[in-house]
Amino acid sequence: ANRNEKLDFLGEGQFATVYKARDKNTNQIVAIKKIKLGHRSEAKDGINRTALREIKLLQELSHPNIIGLLDAFGHKSNISLVFDFMETDLEVIIKDNSLVLTPSHIKAYMLMTLQGLEYLHQHWILHRDLKPNNLLLDENGVLKLADFGLAKSFGSPNWAYTHQVVTRWYRAPELLFGARMYGVGVDMWAVGCILAELLLRVPFLPGDSDLDQLTRIFETLGTPTEEQWPDMCSLPDYVTFKSFPGIPLQHIFIAAGDDLLELIQGLFLFNPCTRITASQALRTKYFSNRPGPTPGCQLPRPNCPVEALKEQSNPAMATKRKRAEALEQ
């Protein structure tokens, strides 16, 4: 642990605090995710299960669009994960109104997201918590999927998963209806929400409760029929909704060409069994048509420091940082 010199506080989540540090041996800049102690019931062998899951998964994965786990160390019931340091994330890029996002930029972000996701799904892993601030970008503009705390291997058949995954705005309708068995479709729906957010520069379906989330989905995309989604009525928390016609996608995404609209439509299919997969998405016309994706080194970089942007939109963050720094003294 002493080989790392702390440089900066980067953020705090429900389960962890993240610091920027320098590896004294290699001079490499890294990010250290310090996992908070779980409650007694959670502390398994002294280590929080979420961390164990993340370590096991990440050690097995190697792909340019997936965050690299460099090291893991711990003592007693405390564990730290050492990752590649990433300059920023997609949420920061989307929120920075001084940046222009061109169709080529958006295509590059989608391409890298789907390549990372295809690799995960080919290894029988669902991410289950995709959102813009889990898509990290390094200084070369390479996007990497991160925060595998909720990731789960879906190879075991009939595994009853929990449906309380994925930040609500990115949550697929089957999860909102309480599905305990689900597959790659939950990640693909989240990708659709992220793509929409890249195009609109604001969250696409920002619901403030599960019911409100479903209402927003159906008002925007139309209420699905039994034909469109045969298993819908048998889901544990299914409730009937008013029949909304939905808004045509070309009226929502006015700048999008037909190839892009086709991809969006595939990502937002209600039936998870027919929803487009990552491999299928990568083979769509959208990715073979011009314009091509922007090379990483030419992608926009945030104009003001990441921390300032986040604190601006979330004053509690500044307070948390000051508190964490005080505790570190």
From Swiss-Prot:
The modification Phosphoserine is found at S156, S313. Phosphorylation of Ser-156 during mitosis inactivates the enzyme. Phosphorylation of Thr-162 is required for activity. Phosphorylated at Ser-156 and Thr-162 by CDK2. GO terms for biological process: cell division; DNA repair; meiotic cell cycle; positive regulation of meiotic cell cycle process involved in oocyte maturation; positive regulation of transcription by RNA polymerase II; protein stabilization; regulation of cell cycle; regulation of G1/S transition of mitotic cell cycle. The modification Phosphothreonine is found at T162. Transmembrane segments: none annotated. Serine/threonine kinase involved in cell cycle control and in RNA polymerase II-mediated RNA transcription. Cyclin-dependent kinases (CDKs) are activated by the binding to a cyclin and mediate the progression through the cell cycle. Each different complex controls a specific transition between 2 subsequent phases in the cell cycle. Required for both activation and complex formation of CDK1/cyclin-B during G2-M transition, and for activation of CDK2/cyclins during G1-S transition (but not complex formation). CDK7 is the catalytic subunit of the CDK-activating kinase (CAK) complex. Phosphorylation at Thr-162 is required for enzymatic activity. The association of p53/TP53 to the CAK complex in response to DNA damage reduces kinase activity toward CDK2 and RNA polymerase II repetitive C-terminal domain (CTD), thus stopping cell cycle progression. Associates primarily with cyclin-H (CCNH) and MAT1 to form the CAK complex. CAK can further associate with the core-TFIIH to form the TFIIH basal transcription factor; this complex is sensitive to UV light. The CAK complex binds to p53/TP53 in response to DNA damage. Interacts with CDK2, SF1/NR5A1, PUF60 and PRKCI. Interacts with HINT1. Belongs to the protein kinase superfamily. CMGC Ser/Thr protein kinase family. CDC2/CDKX subfamily. Keywords: ATP-binding, Cell cycle, Cell division, Cytoplasm, DNA damage, DNA repair, Kinase, Meiosis, Nucleotide-binding, Nucleus, Phosphoprotein, Serine/threonine-protein kinase, Transcription, Transcription regulation, Transferase. Residues 309-329 are annotated as: Disordered. It comes from the Eukaryota. Its EC number is 2.7.11.22, 2.7.11.23. This is Cyclin-dependent kinase 7. It catalyses: L-seryl-[protein] + ATP = O-phospho-L-seryl-[protein] + ADP + H(+); L-threonyl-[protein] + ATP = O-phospho-L-threonyl-[protein] + ADP + H(+); [DNA-directed RNA polymerase] + ATP = phospho-[DNA-directed RNA polymerase] + ADP + H(+). CDD domains: STKc_CDK7. ATP binds at L10, G11, E12, G13, Q14, F15, A16, T17, V18, K33. PROSITE patterns: PROTEIN_KINASE_ATP, PROTEIN_KINASE_DOM, PROTEIN_KINASE_ST. The active site is at D129 (proton acceptor). The gene is Cdk7. It is found in: Nucleus; Cytoplasm; Cytoplasm, Perinuclear region. GO terms for cellular component: CAK-ERCC2 complex; cyclin-dependent protein kinase holoenzyme complex; cytoplasm; germinal vesicle; male germ cell nucleus; nucleus; perinuclear region of cytoplasm; transcription factor TFIIH core complex. GO terms for molecular function: ATP binding; ATP-dependent activity, acting on DNA; cyclin-dependent protein serine/threonine kinase activity; kinase activity; protein kinase activity; protein serine kinase activity; protein-containing complex binding; RNA polymerase II CTD heptapeptide repeat kinase activity. InterPro entries: CDK, CDK7, Kinase-like_dom_sf, Prot_kinase_dom, Protein_kinase_ATP_BS, Ser/Thr_kinase_AS.
